[in-house]
Amino acid sequence: MKAVGLVTEYNPFHNGHIYHIQQAKAVTGADVVIAVMSGNFVQRGEPALFDKWTRTQAALANGVDLVIELPTFYAVQPSHLFAEGAIKLLTALGVEDVVFGSEHATVDFLNLAKQAPSVQGGKAFQEKNQTFAQAYATQLESETGFKLEDPNDILAFGYAKAILNLNSPIKLHAIQRVAAGYHDQSFTDDQTIASASSIRLALHKGKLEKVKGVVPNQTLVDISSANHTVDFESQFWPLLKYRLMTDTIGQLGQVYQMAEGLEHRLAAVALGEPGPQSYQSFIKAVKSKRYTFARIQRTLLYTLLNVKVDQMQAAMQDPYLRILGFTDKGQAYLNGAKKTTTLPLISKVDQHLAKANLRLDFKAGKLWQLLAREPGQQQDIARQPIHFTQAHTKEDK
Amino acid sequence: MKAVGLVTEYNPFHNGHIYHIQQAKAVTGADVVIAVMSGNFVQRGEPALFDKWTRTQAALANGVDLVIELPTFYAVQPSHLFAEGAIKLLTALGVEDVVFGSEHATVDFLNLAKQAPSVQGGKAFQEKNQTFAQAYATQLESETGFKLEDPNDILAFGYAKAILNLNSPIKLHAIQRVAAGYHDQSFTDDQTIASASSIRLALHKGKLEKVKGVVPNQTLVDISSANHTVDFESQFWPLLKYRLMTDTIGQLGQVYQMAEGLEHRLAAVALGEPGPQSYQSFIKAVKSKRYTFARIQRTLLYTLLNVKVDQMQAAMQDPYLRILGFTDKGQAYLNGAKKTTTLPLISKVDQHLAKANLRLDFKAGKLWQLLAREPGQQQDIARQPIHFTQAHTKEDK
């Protein structure tokens, strides 16, 4: 069986994702669609709108055959590490092709990656008033003429770099992003595809009617069940404030990605009087030109999760393939992959795993439940992968 | 000027405290009444109902001349350390007499303390199914014939032991507890004095009318302002659960008074599914016969405050006299005491002190604000001691 891989967050699952799945099959002629998906927290350091099981269910109901969790230590990372983690898992599963959306689908990203500057080189890295990504893009443009600035292009570049680094046989296929830019914050009533961020914004504002045209019906059902994190900030901020006011500067300084004395600023702002009244105003108060919003938010999430540098480095050395769900076809593919994969396949998490390799995902699941309006089912211990069958689909309708 | 010392929590300030102040003056003929008072957290490991400034105001309005904060590292402790901390501060202030309520006011507690067994001795300490305090009381009874079991007697015994340990010149004066036992959970409409715990219970149930007869009017005004912690458990439990789910067992094991592997039980219960739904059910699930309710609750508070054994031991080596408020008479007494006291007198807390000696009180104040229905004013930085004058009193009426 030939498998095509997708790197996804499905936050939430929407019509654009259905188009992506259809195109992936059409472009590659694959029999099986495998999605590597962020778990309960997404790349920008936020809880996913719905938990990983709900999003797995949506993916399986709409054409994906196998959903593998991108572990938290890969998912909540800058794009190059996010991309490398995903490519590593897909390579281990024997996937031959990866199809992704891009703002510049005609660009040969693998070729671009081959010409890319090494991270340390170039004078652009001296500038203080820009983020690392901006500095890197400036350097890349001066050497190749291509301006790497759109989010899907940046991810595509990350996949290409990862393929080179890992010596992976995966072939990349870009499809042109249509209708909705990643950062578009609004959409019209006659659109059938909208960006995930604009959908989240509409849901946050309670505009369910507006969202109807751009998501499968199940997403509307899920949002009405209250087991979601649309309003997570009202829970996130008191917990973060509590953490910042009780940990020592020394403890905060050990948090993953806490760099350049950022811990001092975080503590000073959190403990100030009257102090920020919301998560958004806190981030505004601590943000500098050196960091992107997402970078700050990821660091704050790692602060909240109490993840230290050494724990993170150890975890990243030890990846695994956590199976969240499959169709019959996905199961058949898995049976073949079992014999060849070099990474451990995990279908059930017990107390031992929750304290060892999967500790970070386990903590993330517990935190997700705490941030959701209703905690719902536990996320890891004793949960079985979803086996999605056509009968099941009918039952759901 | 002759000063009498009172060891207090004023949680909340009630008519029994007025009686205590009057008796203290009558028994000793003192000119000045000095109260050492728990700060924002009380001995049983709970946030005080009102913050330390509100309670200081009530004390000054009702006959106390000087209020000194009992630092958190003394206040939130078993009774012998609580008592020793208070006696240490009162001794440093040149206080000659301490007057306290007792269930057995005719007992000579100093004499009892002289006959007391040393902590290590005796076979009663071998029993596993009792608390340390029970074991000690059993041993004491077998040697002296006196059954030390009532809470105010236990504190009195603590004062006496402290006087011996510190070689303090303080003389103890017991007054018989009247009308309300420490643990009485109810009171009748014709009572004018009720126990603090029964008053807290009535306030928790929203029975303001019932409380009118046993507290000064100001307490009723304070409860209506929402800057109080009557419902603290609904805030306390999610924060504690969050702490237990994100810290490692190693980190939890370093918390002050975390003994005999208790951290494993706390984490296992907190992370279990479905898990306790409230703070009370959590405590019930983790409590054993080896620990009193108060002991468990103090340990949980130190867990929430993230206070480690070494930090606590260092803090206890370095006590101070934090001035919360005074009358003119109290101020005059302070001016004299300044010249002779061996402990630092602190009237204003800046960022430096908040990060050094007073760090624990500072954190406790921040946590108190987080647990209160409305956070109110900040508790430490730049707060001035209350200077209470008669004009001020009139203004308040």
From Swiss-Prot, chains A, B:
Subcellular location: Cytoplasm
Stored InterPro entries: Rossmann-like_a/b/a_fold, tRNA(Met)_cyd_acetate_ligase
Pfam families from the UniProt entry: HIGH_NTase1
Annotated ATP binding sites: 7-20, 101, 152, 177
Keyword Metal-binding set for record: no
A GO BP annotation: tRNA modification
Residue ranges crossing the lipid bilayer per the database entry: none
GO CC entries: cytoplasm
EC number from the UniProt entry: 6.3.4.-
Database matches in SUPFAM superfamilies: Nucleotidylyl transferase
Gene3D superfamilies: HUPs (3.40.50.620)
Keywords: ATP-binding, Cytoplasm, Ligase, Nucleotide-binding, RNA-binding, tRNA processing, tRNA-binding
Catalytic class of the enzyme: ligase
Catalytic activity: cytidine(34) in elongator tRNA(Met) + acetate + ATP = N(4)-acetylcytidine(34) in elongator tRNA(Met) + AMP + diphosphate
GO molecular function, one term: tRNA binding
Function: Catalyzes the formation of N(4)-acetylcytidine (ac(4)C) at the wobble position of elongator tRNA(Met), using acetate and ATP as substrates. First activates an acetate ion to form acetyladenylate (Ac-AMP) and then transfers the acetyl group to tRNA to form ac(4)C34.
HAMAP family per record: TmcAL
Family: Belongs to the TmcAL family.
Protein name from the UniProt record: tRNA(Met) cytidine acetate ligase
Organism from which the protein derives: Leuconostoc citreum (strain KM20)
Protein's gene: tmcAL
